[in-house]
């Protein structure tokens, strides 16, 4: 899916593409990033296993949102499916202020989780266009939705 941001204003604007996918508040989320790249630290229980950082949905009932500097992909496994998103990897200075390439938001009511991907923060002159692509993959999987090499390897079959 390719998005375009068009600056129709008469002045220069700073923008960053941002895509949110809402998923059920269950299952497991994982992405390629060291746990120390997650901010704020300690807000959600992430572990590093099988070459990825994992968040298995927990019982906490607070609004929580983390930022992470990943490698341009994240995955979510639940209910027999694996959802993978691939997008441009950002350098550490590319995200918008106070933002990150990967964001995970869990709402207090535990009714959904937002998986967010963000592109580079850039300046658009009047009339300029920014295009940004996010590729989605949906695969069957038969794990118990816990961190596993099987899930990590399955992502590798579509993201090379």
Q: What would you call each of these model-derived segments?
A:
Residues 1, 113, 132-134:
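Hydrophobic residues positioned within well-ordered beta-strands of beta-sheet architectures
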Residues 1-4, 16:
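Short, hydrophobic/aromatic alpha-helical segments in well-folded domains
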Residues 8-130, 141-153:
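A contiguous, surface-exposed recognition patch within enzymatic or periplasmic domains that forms
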Residues 157-160:
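Acidic, Ser/Thr-rich low-complexity intrinsically disordered segments
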């Amino acid at each position: 899916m390719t998005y375009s941001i068009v600056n129709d204003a008469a002045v220069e604007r700073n923008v960053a593409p941002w895509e949110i996918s809402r998923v059920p508040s269950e299952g497991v989320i994982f992405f390629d990033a060291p746990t120390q790249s997650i901010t704020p630290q300690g807000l959600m229980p992430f572990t590093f296993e099988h070459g990825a950082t994992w968040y298995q949905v927990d019982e906490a009932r607070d609004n929580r949102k983390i930022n992470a500097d990943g490698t341009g992909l994240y995955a979510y496994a639940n209910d027999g499916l694996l959802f993978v998103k691939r997008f441009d990897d950002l350098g550490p200075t590319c995200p918008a202020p106070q933002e990150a390439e990967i964001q995970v938001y869990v709402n207090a009511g535990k009714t959904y989780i937002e998986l967010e991907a963000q592109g580079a923060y850039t300046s658009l002159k009047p009339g300029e266009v920014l295009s940004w692509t996010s590729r989605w993959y949906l695969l069957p999987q038969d794990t118990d939705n816990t961190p596993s090499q099987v899930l990590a390897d399955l992502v590798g079959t579509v993201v090379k």
